[in-house]
Amino acid sequence: KNRLLFPIIFAFIFSACSDFSGNEDEVEASLKPVAKQKKKVEEEATRTYYDLNGITFGNNTFVAVGEKGTVRTSSDNGATWDNGTRGTTSELNEIAYGDSTFVAVGERGTHLYSRDDGTTWDNGTWSDDDHVTGVAFGSNSFIGVSSTYLTKSTDNGSNWVRGCSGVRVYDMAFGNNKFVGSGAEGAIQISDNGSGCSTPSGSGSRTTEETLYGITFGNNRFLTVGSDGWLSITGDNGNNFTALTIPTGANHLYSTAYGNNIFVAVGSKSVVVSDNDFSEDPILKANSYTFNDVTFGNGVFVAVGNDEIIYTSTDGDDWTKVHGK
């Protein structure tokens, strides 16, 4: 009897061990996603997130710029983001696209340009070290803005010259063959090409003493946004502005963009949406987000903020976080 039992017991043990050995790979494989996710969480918890100040769209690519020369790019409508090579360690304030070129401007007179969709950057030739806060493209020229003068490049960012002086604008937009800038104490500047500037001549040219941080062009109108939720529009290329009703609860607005037949303005815990003809008062859609800049492309609004936060929306109402802390 014992001789018969031994082979049976041995066969049972061998079979059990074989089953366990065969499952080792399966067990290890099942643990890998958990370990991978844990590693990703740990990396995200310890990595440094930089503030993003500006964003634009061109050549089916979103490019965002910010603190310490940070560059982030997306070619899938904002779903995923890659790191561009930093062309500087200076703060980058704003970015624009035109003629197959991205141009970013910032502190200490920084003027950078990229011709490969934000992957690599070169320094434009510029001698001054004033802070440049905005940039726009139009009439085959890039125009940068500072608190005292404009800068201008006609060779896609390679070389820059000083434009008109005495301006006090923070941002600029191009439309109807005009550059219109907005800035301190309701200041508005109009220029054909950045070399010469004029102040609006209309009786409604200066409607506020509020600081106008952002401006955009859409549906044949310029829209400015600023401190304390200020919004104003012009349909005559900047000569006369009309103040809009400030939405209840709106705070400082820093940027605005046009797309999908609406204007979207973003700022300090404020997202404001207006229809394209301003037949109704602007509406505060969200008061939990703080964004520094917003742009539109491929049917999507993309907004950026501190700690590298990036959100997307199609209507300015519902926002999805796609990147950041």
Model-assigned labels for residue ranges:
Residues 15-16:
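C-terminal motif of bacterial Sec signal peptides marking the signal peptidase cleavage site
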Residues 19:
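Short, conserved catalytic or interaction motifs in soluble domains
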Residues 29-325:
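Residue-level hotspots at or immediately adjacent to binding/recognition sites across diverse folds
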Residues 9:
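Flanking scaffold residues of small Cys/His-coordinated metal-binding clusters
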Residues 1-6:
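Bacterial N-terminal signal peptides that target proteins for export
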